[in-house]
Amino acid sequence: DVSRIVRSYPGVSFSPIGYRNDLIVRGGSPSENRFYMDGIEIPNINHFATQGASGGPVSIVNADLIREITFYTGAFPANRSGALSSVLDFQLKDGNPDKQAFKATIGASEVSLSGAGHLGQRTTYLFSARQSYLQLLFKALGLPFLPNFIDGQFKTKTRFNEHSELTLLGLAGIDKMKLNTDEKGEDAEYLLSYLPTIHQETFTLGASYRHYNGRHVQSLILSHNYLNNRNLKYRNNDDSSEDNLTLRLRSTEQKTTLRFENQTRLGAWTLKEGAELNNSIYTNHSRQRPVSYTHLR
């Protein structure tokens, strides 16, 4: 998990909640960090993330696909706008131009499949997909909540000639948490009394066109991010009737970005200039009913 690794750097502290990997840089908020992958902004890199924060228990990004990471805690590059605490910049590997290679892995909590290769002479690809079986482990351990996640990512790079290339990139994560109402006992019943069911989806799709012209490098980047978060809670966890509904939350965040960058090398100096357009849409629908309890003596 990359987020847990960079927590050992100076000025970086960790969340007091042990299972989360929030980055708290120089006293800033976890929501003040920015993440980029091959120049494309990624709003969320963790499963079961909390809106308004950047952390979660499990990373969406497959570390096997990462070639290089640059972590900024200050002096942010001009083309990495909007960050107040830190910037975590991922560079993914390219696909294999010579052969097709695939890898299957069975881990302690998930199974995964990844691959790298080429599509013709000009295009390479890289992909990864994971499916967890945490819900089976949690049920076997007798826990009252059953989390599950799926994620996937891909990258293709097409080299038109020695001066221009096009990169397509995608990242997706789906999180679900159900309740194990079969569990009995005081602790389990207490957790089941307030924990909601969770369904969360996050998607990022982007394209980056890059042109090399001597000392100049021009980039045109188009990306779209989407986050959907739904929580439901029923009285006594009985979803047979809408009358039992005590909490319904649906929140979505969407952001479309178009960015142009020009980079010029002037001896030991690098000059960067560009422009960026953003279109953001936020919606929130919530419904909550008060729940009354009667204590009998």
Language model region names:
Residues 1, 20, 56, 66, ...:
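Transmembrane beta-barrel architecture of outer-membrane proteins
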Residues 1-76, 87-93:
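Periplasmic N-terminal accessory/gating domains of Gram-negative outer-membrane beta-barrel systems
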Residues 16-17, 63, 80, 105-107, ...:
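Short sequence motifs at beta-strands and strand-loop junctions characteristic
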Residues 32, 64, 97-99, 110, ...:
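Strand-connecting loop/turn motifs
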Residues 34, 68-79, 85-93, 100-144, ...:
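Predominantly transmembrane beta-strands of Gram-negative outer membrane beta-barrel pores used
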Residues 50-55, 71-72, 96-98, 136-140, ...:
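Extracytoplasmic loops and strand-loop junctions of Gram-negative outer membrane beta-barrel proteins
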